[in-house]
From Swiss-Prot:
Protein name according to UniProt: Protein-L-isoaspartate O-methyltransferase
SUPFAM superfamilies reported for this sequence: S-adenosyl-L-methionine-dependent methyltransferases (SSF53335)
EC number of this enzyme: 2.1.1.77
Domain of life: Bacteria
Gene3D superfamilies, per database record: Vaccinia Virus protein VP39
Pfam families cross-referenced by the UniProt entry: PCMT
Originating species: Shewanella baltica (strain OS195)
Protein family according to the UniProt entry: Belongs to the methyltransferase superfamily. L-isoaspartyl/D-aspartyl protein methyltransferase family.
GO cellular component entries: cytoplasm
Record lineage: Bacteria, Pseudomonadati, Pseudomonadota, Gammaproteobacteria, Alteromonadales
UniProtKB keywords: Cytoplasm, Methyltransferase, S-adenosyl-L-methionine, Transferase
Length: 211
């Protein structure tokens, strides 16, 4: 990570703290992650702005505040095994991989999945398992998960993901069609309780795979 990038990432973490992010481990991970690595060169100059940016295939890299907020919500109970649905650029996975012992991540667009895998390898993050597939279905043979994060908006809460939560596990995801609500769902036995966190805007969670 270059000196300029490090300074920019540290300044971004400070801005996120001012915006309400309080988990110091999350802020540290943000400050150590070169966000420009996850963008095309033409957009690298915008890497440390607190905004979502396009990454191709109709997808985006999420606003850093949302990345930090969802991570903060996910870490509430110190999960050991985490599933991310929607690898995208790999930036969110890079943050999570610094904070949890084991991360599994699914992406339905093959090209994005390949790029993300290469980026995390370059960052020497080796506690991540990648899957090319339909995120609506989760990753059953790696379940149960202590926490699941969905980085695209589901029209309804996917039943498969609920079933793959461990006892006491949490599911953090945006739900809705146009503007969505960020929700945290907690499993207690066979029951699920939900909290609505804030209004957000994500690309839709789409069924199936795309080469």
């Amino acid at each position: 990570m270059t000196r300029v990038a490090l300074t920019s990432a540290v300044n971004l973490a400070k801005k996120l703290h001012d915006a309400g992010i309080r988990n110091q481990a999350v802020l540290k991970a943000i400050s150590h992650t070169p966000r420009e690595m996850f963008l095309d060169n033409a957009l690298a100059h915008k890497a440390y702005e607190n905004t979502a940016l396009p990454i191709g295939q109709g997808q985006t890299i999420s606003q850093p505040y949302i990345v930090a907020r969802m991570t903060e919500l996910l870490l509430h109970k110190m999960p050991q095994r985490v599933l991310e649905v929607g690898t995208g650029s790999g930036y969110q996975a890079a943050i999570l991989a610094q904070l949890v012992p084991q991360l599994c991540t699914i992406e339905r667009i093959k090209g994005l999945q390949i790029q993300a895998r290469q980026r995390l390898k370059r960052l020497d993050l080796h506690n991540v398992s990648f899957k090319y597939g339909d995120g609506w279905l989760g990753w059953a043979n790696r379940s149960p998960f202590d926490a699941i994060m969905v980085t695209a908006a589901a029209s309804t809460i996917p039943e498969a993901l609920l079933s793959q939560l461990a006892e006491g596990g949490v599911l953090v995801l945006p739900v809705g069609e146009d503007t969505q609500q960020l929700m945290r769902i907690t499993r207690t036995g066979e029951r699920f309780s939900s909290e609505t966190i804030e209004t957000v805007k994500f690309v839709p969670l789409i069924n199936g795979e795309l080469a």
